[in-house]
């Protein structure tokens, strides 16, 4: 079982089925994630938890390529929002993105 924390909005979007792809840095911790694994997401603010199953794992050189491969809704944007790979720099430094690359985790909500 893998465990990850999420901000409230992406947590809500996964919970209601809107967000089906979680984006992370492809670092040492994420390299252990495989199709069929379970991930427990914890809401950073409320402590609520969601359980998901990993349905797909895709690695990209950067978030630019990842964003091109998925619909903006599936990665957590609303249809009226502009999806920008630069948004990921809120979470990861450009140096780390270049070093590790981007990881798209296709997920299915269990509970």
Question: What residue spans do the PLM features occupy?
Answer:
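Short, solvent-exposed beta-strand-terminating loops
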Residues: 57-67
